[in-house]
UniProtKB/Swiss-Prot annotation:
Gene name of this polypeptide: PP2C13
Protein name: Probable protein phosphatase 2C member 13, mitochondrial
One GO biological process term: signal transduction
Tissue: Highly expressed in mature pollen grains.
Chief subcellular location: mitochondrion
Something else known: Plants silencing PP2C13 exhibit a major loss of seed-set fertility, without visible defect in pollen development. Plants silencing PP2C13 show up-regulation of AOX1A gene which is regulated by mitochondrial retrograde signaling.
Biological role: Probable protein phosphatase that may play a role as a mitochondrial signal transduction mediator in pollen germination. May function in retrograde signaling from the mitochondria to the nucleus. May be a downstream factor of cytoplasmic male sterility (CMS). CMS is caused by genetic incompatibility between nuclei and mitochondria within male reproductive organs.
Species this protein is from: Oryza sativa subsp. japonica (Rice)
Intracellular or extracellular location(s): Mitochondrion
One CC-aspect GO term: mitochondrion
């Protein structure tokens, strides 16, 4: 997602496009040669002083799904379980970098399964979170896939904080869309502040689904995707945030940024997505403002698939939801989709959450 090799080549174009005077950016202390966070520095001098952007190439730590590390990373069981929700299973692949699990509500109306695989990558930068809770007697379910780039920290931060922040929002039950939008952007700000002294520039996507009563809210930042099956047809509830999307390109250019071809279309010739958490060096062009879709949970809504682009790069929307409708256990669906993506040559981490809606049925 991040092309560091092209960053140095593209930066002069970005600088010329954004200002006619000496460019000055707000940079973390680690990148500004000891200048306090919030101080402006000459970006050209910074580039010379740090031998280009080699300093941003921070080796991501290996994150294997052993029983301890998977649990610590939120990669096993939901952290909160509402009354009436029962765990079905949880498996981890140890050194294989594989984890999966699932649960079902006792009334049989909602089932969830998830699978996460390091795949062909040496490091794991995908995270996911599943939470079930109750607020003022209202059952709430939250599902999220976070695909990191430039390191795992941003995705891990979202797993640890995004839903916790959302559940604390005062308007969560009364204006859920507003709560989601504000929480996404606040969490992004909090992450950037927490990393202000860190010598890295991690970023992450977020594809989330929040079920409150009979309403499903799907929010997206980046190129992870959410797809539902509605009345037998696959329907994407999110649109990938790519720099060559006409509306996204216009937004970036209006903010003073540029979209450059460097193997694919990239913001400033660097990032192959137009919205993300983190990526402080590309703010304000790369934002964490989500696009949100609301769906009524009725008999037409059959299933939901959330996944990172490691799946969607090689699996079509229709194929994913078709499998989700034919299998009884959503964990089995998630595992099969992960295996299909890997067998088709997906070179990325692969993470998938499958939610099945069963209307007027009991187990």
């Amino acid at each position: 997602m991040v092309c560091f090799a092209s960053l140095r080549r593209a930066l002069p174009l970005l600088l010329r496009a954004t200002t006619t005077t000496t460019p000055r950016f707000l940079l973390p202390r680690a990148l500004s040669g000891g200048v306090g966070g919030g101080a402006a520095v000459d970006a050209r001098a910074l580039l010379r002083g740090h031998s280009g952007w080699r300093g941003l190439r921070v080796a991501a730590r290996m994150m294997l799904d052993s029983s301890d590390s998977a649990a610590a990373a939120g990669q096993m069981q939901p952290q909160q379980r509402a009354a009436g929700a029962v765990a079905c299973s949880a498996q981890d692949g140890g050194a294989a970098g594989y984890a999966s699990g699932g649960w079902a509500r006792e009334d049989g109306k909602l089932k969830c399964g998830y699978s996460s695989f390091r795949g062909k990558r040496a490091t794991m930068e995908d995270f996911y979170d599943v939470k079930l809770t109750e607020i003022d007697g209202q059952a709430v379910s939250l599902f999220g896939v976070f695909d990191g780039h430039g390191g795992p920290r941003a995705a891990e931060y979202l797993k640890e904080n995004l839903f916790e922040n959302l559940l604390k929002h005062p308007e969560f039950l009364t204006d859920t869309k507003l709560a989601i939008s504000e929480t996404y952007q606040k969490t992004d700000t909090d992450f950037l502040e927490s990393e202000s002294n860190a010598f890295r520039d991690d970023g992450s996507t977020a594809s989330t689904a929040v079920l409150v009563g009979g309403h499903l809210y799907v929010a997206n930042v980046g190129d992870s995707r959410a797809v539902v099956s509605k009345a037998g047809k696959a329907m994407a509830l999110s649109e990938d945030h790519k720099p060559n999307r006409s509306d996204e390109r216009k937004r970036i250019e209006n903010a003073g940024g540029v979209v450059i071809w460097a193997g694919t279309w990239r913001v400033g010739g660097v990032l192959a997505m137009s919205r993300a958490f983190g990526n402080r060096l590309l703010k304000p062009f790369v934002v964490a403002e989500p696009e949100i879709q609301e769906e009524l949970v009725n008999e037409d809504l059959e299933c939901l698939v959330l996944a990172s682009d490691g799946l969607w790069d090689v699996v079509e929307n229709e194929e994913a939801v078709s499998l989700a409708k034919t299998e009884d256990l959503p964990e089995s669906v998630a595992r099969k989709l992960t295996e299909i993506a890997y067998s088709r040559g997906s070179a990325d981490n692969i993470t998938c959450i499958v939610v099945q809606f069963h209307h007027d049925k009991t187990e």
